[in-house]
Amino acid sequence: MQPQIKDLYQKFKESSGISTDSRTMKKDNIFFCLSGDNFDGNDYAEDALNKGASLCVIDNPEFAKKSEKFLLVRDSLDTLQELAKYHRDKLNIPIVGITGSNGKTTTKNLLEVALSVKYNVYATEGNFNNHIGVPLSILKINNSHEIGIIEMGASSVGEIAELCQIAKPSCGLITNISKAHIKGFKSFEGVVRGKSELFDYLNKNNGQIIINNYDSTLVNFIKRFDNPILIEGGKSNIDVKISKSKDGLKLFEPNIFFMVRNLNSGLYEEKKSKLFGRYNFENILMAISVAKFFKIDEQESAEKICIWDMPPNNRSQVIKVAGSNIILDAYNANPQSMKNAIESVQNFSENEKVFIIGDMNELGDISKHEHSEVGKLTSKLESTECFFVGDKMEDAYKMNKNSRWFKTYNEMHDSLAKMRFQNVDVLVKGSRSLRLERIQTTLKKILT
């Protein structure tokens, strides 16, 4: 540990928090000057100081003499991470680490809801799940919190291992493993190796491993680690009991139902969840099972989750327009999440379907094959209009000649704006770079 971390930690305790963005920082924040490929964070140090920063952590010696409130370090990012590690060691609370190819953020949100029945919980905000976001999240945990939930993302082998050294999880869950970020991981085996770094850390540090035994890859981990907790429920997708009592979950594609106890009559009533789809069914099961590990009754978890609304973050949002539904799932996309979304929307209602599907990025050598598979899948569906968007989706178009392909978002938008639809379910899904959520305003106009 650098000698200055202890001193910096004292200044952190006296501050109003940490900031890495001078545009949003608050008075008395400590400002860390982080640099990227196209910017030097040190250039914003004086601006941060003028806005009330109590201290600026810089790593460019040329700035060192400009103010006594500039703290020169070897590397600002390394110092941020070391400060987070030091803070984590001071926190005497369990931290749940969550990673996986799909469903990390939704499962994190559901688990926060379930754990809040009994505990004061801090959970990663938004998608702060990388080498910058994880230390910032750890530094937001304070003495009032009783449990932390830290989401961990990765696009190459070794990244989860590094994040574990910062967050030091005492319990961990991998939601699932699929073909995501293949370009960085190099292969599916690389994805498996990278995601399993969470379990490796827990195994070495006497942490509790929780395995989603619905996932065919994760099932292979059951014998690899000692005493894992398995997500409860059988393989049936019709009726999965989550305890020995009458409470349970039911999946009638695509809807999820809870058996919730009526506090007045004491009887169990079937209530429809605000989430839908097989993938969210598993996300709910994982959240309830982890909460049970922390001594929270499944019925109490279910009652909270049953009334929970998906936040407006472009993930599995359902927007009702007249007799139509927009299913907005445009935060990101990979082969498995794309397949899940298409199949769930196909069963969503009796409406005809409109698919607006964008590129799946970071697939490396398997990109052409996986985009072609999307085309094959959609070609088998009846009563559908399919709009493919982006360079890579041309391969999908070639496999579905009844579809339409647009090289750019603007081309797709201009074509779609001239159309009219009634009583349809519209899926909007693609990688983040396309920002397909922009189409919702136009969709609301043409769904008349």
What are these regions (language model features)?
Residues 1-82, 86, 276, 346-350, ...:
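N-terminal leader/targeting and accessory segments in enzymes
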Residues 3, 62-66, 173-325, 347-351, ...:
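Acidic, Mg2+-coordinating active-site environments of NTP-dependent enzymes
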Residues 4, 78-213, 217-227, 291, ...:
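Phosphate-binding loop of NTP-binding sites
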Residues 29, 48, 83, 98, ...:
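Residue-level signal for inorganic ion chemistry
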Residues 34-39, 310-312, 330-402, 431, ...:
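Active-site beta-alpha connecting loops in nucleotide-dependent enzymes
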Residues 98, 313-316, 433, 437-439:
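ATP-dependent carboxylate/acyl-activation modules
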Residues 405, 423-441:
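Peripheral docking tails and interdomain loops at the edges
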